[in-house]
Amino acid sequence: MTYSLRIADIPVSERPRERLISVGAKNLSNAELLAILLATGQGKGKLSAVGLGQHILNELSKYRRDPLDVLRDIHPQELTAIHGIGPAKATTILAAIELGKRAFQRRPTEKMVIDSPDTAAAILGHELMYQSQERFAVILLDVKNQLIALKVITIGTATETLVHPREIFREVVKQSATKLIIAHNHPTGSLVPSQDDILLTEQLLQGATYLAIPLLDHLILGNGNFQSLRQITDLWEKYPQED
């Protein structure tokens, strides 16, 4: 596909919208998907919509990160700084990104059963995934693993959040929970637990054992994925929980 051509000059079978209908969205390039949102082109060299979409990706690659990672958290002013992108195009892109985030973030419902790391991570996504600051949250459950509440305990900086076991167990007692799952996000996208993460988990497991309120897991969320500390550490063998 020639990026300098107008969409009208491109054979119908190669136009982004027509290709999406014929082969499906997942088979379109990132530039083609952006072109559908942009609707029209221009910018330097009077680029087509596809060309302008590719130009956006090229500009974002200057951040030395995957352009889609940059696009996920981009501000309107950063988009409009790209030649050929005005407020209308920028807001259309940002609205599409936000809609995509919401579509893949499952909101918790009352009495929902949380019986696996996958289910827990799914309901935590809305509060923890794709955040620019570290957040620490707790899922509070009843004896049947049914959801009582999901609470964000603290919001920190881009690299750390400070939380004390006392704050977590205060919420457990307040909500009359009998089990809990803790979680926090890493804005960098890394799912590797830090030494502080391990230490806090140990402290909470000890406290949970003492109070006879099982801590089922500690999840780390980032970049659309998650990690379960229960699955990758031996902490639950050292501090068994009656779950």
Swiss-Prot record:
Disulfide cross-links: none
Alphabetically sorted, this entry's keywords are: Hydrolase, Metal-binding, Metalloprotease, Protease, Zinc
Q: Name the residues that bind Zn(2+).
A: H184, H186, D197
What's a BP term from Gene Ontology annotated to this protein? proteolysis
Q: Which GO terms describe its molecular function?
A: metal ion binding; metallopeptidase activity
Q: Where is this motif: JAMM motif?
A: 184-197
Q: Where is the MPN domain?
A: 113-235
Q: Which PROSITE patterns match?
A: MPN (PS50249)
Pfam families listed in its UniProt record: RadC, UPF0758_N
Q: Would you identify the family this protein belongs to, as annotated?
A: Belongs to the UPF0758 family.
Q: What is this protein called?
A: UPF0758 protein MAE_44350
